[in-house]
Amino acid sequence: MKQAAIKPQITFDDFTKLDIRLGTIMGVDEVEKSDKLMKLTVDFGDHQRTILAGIKQERENPAEIEGLQALFVVNLPERKMAGEVSQGMLFDIGFEDKQLPCLAIPEKPMPNGCRAG
């Protein structure tokens, strides 16, 4: 496998600006106007968010991730896609390396809303 190139160096301050949190995927729904996006309802402990993720073609059954905990970037600006609004980004592994992506998940259950870093 040829790995993706390492991205340009960033400062530690740049890294600390990312707010990556653990959430439980409570729902996985179709986005009617997209052949790639699925709408995830994610529980972050003190609130829920809608996050659009391009997983429709990556998984035989996208709903299989319902109930799993995963990492999400939560401090991106809201983004409208295919008539829906996304309030963050799913943090997955493999896409940049042309691999079938998988979720970044904790090795044991942790409270929703916990920060990665």
Residue locations for each model-derived region?
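Phosphate-backbone binding interfaces of nucleic-acid-interacting proteins
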Residues: 1-117
